[in-house]
């Protein structure tokens, strides 16, 4: 069984290696481990040995090999023990000198100053994250409040927008265009006052305060449209004109307005601003400059 494990010598690059076979089974039985090196026992010096060593240390702190061997013979100890004793004695002497001269006192002082440095560094680090002054802290909240006041329907004043009311007669859609682009009153008010959608057209000058039917931006034109334009416009909201969609896509200028003189509610473009007609027998619906 062990014949194939213990292989004979073999040739490597034509060179025959002579020798006995190696046991490939690294068992603890076949290879006894070396015993662990025992720790050297602590040397205990007697009073007489210490007196001899101290007398030599008083002469010189660094004895040469001959002095150490001579002292080792006197105290009956190996020279290596004498050498170690001198090394320890020199270290003890240096420690005593440092304590006597006060060189060891600044070390605790340095340790005391290190927490102060850490405190200063922490203070500087915390200073970077100090809260802004009260005036600066209010700025984000005021900005958020301004954003809410623009886009939130609850914060919009219920007062009707003059621009959305005044542009209703001029910008109302006819039956040829389907009424599918209705918007909420809050959304139309947020865009109704923008002058970029109406290039030079000041429809606020044509506001007629004589009709209470247009007091709310979301009210319909059914009382007026039933008598003048037919029932096909009774479901169109008055705030449809303030979308910014019709004004920007049609490209109205300062002289553009829609005419409802025709009862079929057809679009008539490119005529003077003086051609904007009134409704309901020209008696109760008159445009006047405010």
Swiss-Prot record:
One of its GO terms (cellular component) is nucleus. It is found in: Nucleus. One of its GO terms (biological process) is anterior/posterior pattern specification. Residues 38-97 bind DNA. Keywords: Developmental protein, Differentiation, DNA-binding, Homeobox, Nucleus, Transcription, Transcription regulation. Residues 93-144 are annotated as: Disordered. Its main location: nucleus. It comes from the Eukaryota. Signal peptide: none annotated. GO terms for molecular function: DNA-binding transcription factor activity, RNA polymerase II-specific; RNA polymerase II cis-regulatory region sequence-specific DNA binding. Initially expressed in the Spemann organizer region of early gastrula embryos. Expression then becomes localized to the anterior region; confined to the cement gland anlage at stages 19-25 and localized to the forebrain, optic vesicle and otocyst at stage 28. Residues 94-103, 116-129 have a biased composition (Polar residues). Pfam families: Homeodomain (PF00046), TF_Otx (PF03529). InterPro entries: HD (IPR001356), Homeobox_CS (IPR017970), Homeodomain-like_sf (IPR009057), Otx_TF (IPR003025), Otx_TF_C (IPR013851). Transcription factor involved in anterior and eye development. Promotes the differentiation of both rod and cone photoreceptors cells in the retina. Together with other retinal homeobox proteins, acts as an effector of a cellular clock which, depending on cell cycle progression, establishes the generation of distinct retinal neuronal cell types. Acts synergistically with nrl to activate the rhodopsin promoter. Promotes the formation of anterior regions and represses the formation of posterior structures during development. This is Homeobox protein otx5-A.
């Amino acid at each position: 069984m062990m014949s194939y494990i213990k292989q004979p010598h073999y040739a490597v690059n034509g060179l025959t290696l002579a020798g006995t076979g190696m046991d490939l089974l690294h068992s603890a039985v076949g290879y006894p481990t070396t015993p662990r090196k025992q720790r050297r026992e602590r040397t205990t010096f007697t009073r007489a040995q210490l007196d001899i060593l101290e007398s030599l240390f008083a002469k010189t702190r660094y004895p040469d090999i001959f002095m150490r061997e001579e002292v080792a013979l006197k105290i009956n100890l190996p020279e290596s023990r004498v050498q170690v004793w001198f090394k320890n004695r020199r270290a003890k002497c240096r420690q005593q000198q440092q304590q006597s001269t006060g060189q060891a006192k600044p070390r605790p002082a340095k340790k005391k100053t290190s927490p102060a440095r850490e405190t200063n560094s922490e203070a500087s680090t915390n200073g970077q994250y100090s809260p802004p002054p009260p005036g600066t802290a209010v700025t984000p909240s005021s900005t958020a409040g301004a954003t809410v006041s623009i886009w939130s329907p609850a914060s919009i004043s219920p007062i009707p927008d003059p621009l959305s009311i005044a542009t209703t007669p001029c910008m109302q859609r006819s039956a040829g265009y389907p009424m599918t682009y209705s918007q909420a009153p809050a959304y139309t008010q947020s865009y109704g006052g923008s002058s970029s959608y109406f290039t030079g057209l000041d429809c606020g000058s044509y506001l007629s305060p004589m009709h209470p039917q247009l007091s709310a931006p979301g009210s319909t034109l059914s009382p007026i449209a039933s008598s003048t334009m037919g029932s096909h416009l009774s479901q169109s909201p008055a705030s449809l004109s303030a979308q910014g969609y019709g004004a920007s896509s049609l490209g109205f200028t300062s002289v553009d307005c829609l005419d409802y003189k025709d009862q079929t509610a057809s679009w008539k473009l490119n005529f003077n601003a003086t051609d904007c007609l009134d409704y309901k027998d020209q008696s109760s619906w008159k445009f006047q400059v405010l």
